[in-house]
């Protein structure tokens, strides 16, 4: 599913909302998640999961073609941990 499909589904399920308003809401939700993570905050959506930032230390990697050692800089990467409700649903354990 892509963002436009999500917007369409939400708009279809909420006929009292205009599609452009749904689009603004969805975009705002994503922007707020991105902003919080940019500040190093964790974003938890109960039952769905939690978005957080993991820090990777600098390390020495290898160029796969040449085998030459390469310095890999420290970096921050997004991380998502699924919530119990989502995990259970994916594994067919719905209530």
UniProtKB/Swiss-Prot annotation:
Q: One Pfam family, short name please?
A: Bac_DNA_binding
Question: Per its UniProt record, what Gene3D superfamilies does this chain match?
Answer: IHF-like DNA-binding proteins
Q: Which UniProt keywords apply?
A: DNA recombination, DNA-binding, Transcription, Transcription regulation, Translation regulation
InterPro entries per UniProt: Hist_DNA-bd, Histone-like_DNA-bd_CS, IHF-like_DNA-bd_dom_sf, IHF_beta
* SUPFAM superfamilies per the UniProt record, alphabetical: IHF-like DNA-binding proteins
Query: Which Gene Ontology molecular-function terms are recorded?
Result: DNA binding; structural constituent of chromatin
What GO biological process terms are annotated to this protein in UniProt?
DNA recombination; regulation of DNA-templated transcription; regulation of translation
One Gene Ontology cellular component annotation held by this UniProt entry: cytosol
* Recorded superkingdom: Bacteria
Q: Does the keyword Metal-binding apply?
A: no
Q: Does the keyword Transcription regulation apply?
A: yes
Q: Where do the coiled-coil regions begin and end?
A: none
Family indicated by similarity: Belongs to the bacterial histone-like protein family.
Q: How does it assemble?
A: Heterodimer of an alpha and a beta chain.
Question: Which NCBIfam families has this protein been placed in?
Answer: hip (TIGR00988), PRK00199.1 (NF001222)
- Please describe what this protein does: This protein is one of the two subunits of integration host factor, a specific DNA-binding protein that functions in genetic recombination as well as in transcriptional and translational control.
Q: What is this protein called?
A: Integration host factor subunit beta
- From what organism does this protein derive? Dinoroseobacter shibae (strain DSM 16493 / NCIMB 14021 / DFL 12)
């Amino acid at each position: 599913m892509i963002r436009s499909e999500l917007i369409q589904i939400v708009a279809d399920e909420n006929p009292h909302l205009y599609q452009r308003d749904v689009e603004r809401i969805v975009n705002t939700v994503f922007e707020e998640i991105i902003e919080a993570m940019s500040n190093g905050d964790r974003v938890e959506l109960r039952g769905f999961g939690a978005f957080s930032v993991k820090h990777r230390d600098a390390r020495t990697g290898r160029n796969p073609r040449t085998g030459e050692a390469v310095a890999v800089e420290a970096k921050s990467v997004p991380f998502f941990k699924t919530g119990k409700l989502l995990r259970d649903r994916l594994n067919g354990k719905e209530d």
